[in-house]
Amino acid sequence: MEIYLVDGTYELFRHYYALPSVRDRDGREVAAVRGVLSSVLGMIKGGATHIAVATDHVIESFRNKLWPGYKTGDGIEPDLLAQFSLLEEVLVAAGVVVWPMVEFEADDAMAAAAVAASKNTDVTRVILCTPDKDLAQCVSGSRIVQLNRRKQITIDEAGVIQKFGVAPESIPDYLALVGDAADGYPGLPGWGAKSSAAVLAKFLHLESIPKNWREWRVNATNPGSLADTLCREWENAILFRRLATLRTDIRLFDDVDELRWLGPSSGFDALAARLDATRTERTPAATRRKSSATKS
């Protein structure tokens, strides 16, 4: 079986800025919710049997306590923020497993779920549906892959190396050096993508990079200056790597079959009608997901 893990936050942002405004009868902006719902149901109609959507129910996470400049909900359009809880409600009614993250981020949920699902021998592939470079650290061979659904590009481990110049395990170190503007941390001055990739392709992790740049023997611009910066900014480099490292110790499910889609709830049609969303056929009640009381 294949497991599809969807970045609901990314999808909501993408549809919000791609679609014209639509409001429901109560005046709520719902265009992005409609777009994401249609997209997820399209995946199911296309053959996805096991699917879960992770969202940032609250934009802030534990990382905001580590770095004051880390991303927050400031500046996000109120009409967009208001659709997070609505999206979660609609997807749950549609029968889709939703993980609304509070202390952790949606990316953490996807990372934890990918690792957990990949341990199941019945799982042939885990598909991370997001273009977010953070999730590249979770890619493993061709078993855990990353899918950019908008561009229809699937990246396996070889693809990560081709794209970033480093293996998945080095992605947090890479982001620590180059920074991530979307997440709000700057990286180290002077450390660009090419030099960072060249150094980490050889040494893998920050701790393994020699302090003496003459030992590097890689094609990097101004290696002496880079070495000095790394030494001077060492604490920030380690902190930024911690920000970039996704948490995989979050327990989200006990069995991957909990992610199987078994059809919408009885209240979905009424909710969908309010959104003028696509209706789906309901599966027999006997085949619906087992209750938590039956879990081992």
Predicted regions and their residues:
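Domain-level signal for Mg2+-assisted phosphodiester chemistry and nucleotide/NA-binding surfaces
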Residues: M1-G95, K151, E258
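Extended two-metal-dependent nuclease catalytic cores across DNA- and RNA-processing enzymes
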Residues: V22, G73-D254, T278
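Low-complexity, acidic/Ser/Thr- and charged residue-rich accessory regions of DNA metabolism proteins
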Residues: T229-S296
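Short alpha-helical interface elements
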Residues: A31-R34, S38-L41, S61, K65-P68, ...
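Conserved beta-strand edge residues that scaffold enzyme active sites
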Residues: H57-V58, E105, A286
